Design a protein with these regions (language model features):
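Basic, Lys/Arg-enriched alpha-helical interface segments
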Residues: 1-59, 64, 78
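Enriched for short, Lys/Arg-rich terminal
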Residues: 21, 67-100
Length: 100
């Protein structure tokens, strides 16, 4: 099984998502975060399941519609490790901090 490492900024992404969910969907917000983390756990067994993105990055599509998110990650086969770099809502326009 592959190892999964979350970049420190992923915590900020999850905080932002949770804040948005509490504002718009209330009590159901924590279950969205559980769904996101459960989907990321799939990468332990299937690190190449995400669609190819730019360069050596991949995107894992999580859920759909209002519950839709995208996790940007890099799989390093030599280390058998998945590095999750960012998470955003499908309606968000890109990975802001990744575009520099």
């Amino acid at each position: 099984m592959s190892r999964i490492e979350l970049a420190p900024e992923v915590g900020d992404d999850l905080d932002r998502i949770l804040e948005h969910l509490f504002a718009h969907q209330g009590a159901d917000a924590p279950s969205h975060i559980e769904d996101i983390m459960g989907a990321i756990d799939v990468l332990e067994r299937n690190p190449l399941i995400g669609r190819p993105a730019r360069a050596d990055l991949r995107e894992l599509v999580i859920g759909r519609r209002a519950r839709g998110y995208v996790a940007l990650y890099r799989y390093v086969a030599a280390l058998d490790t998945v590095f999750v770099l960012a998470i955003r809502g499908q309606n968000e326009a890109g990975y802001t901090r990744m575009q520099a």
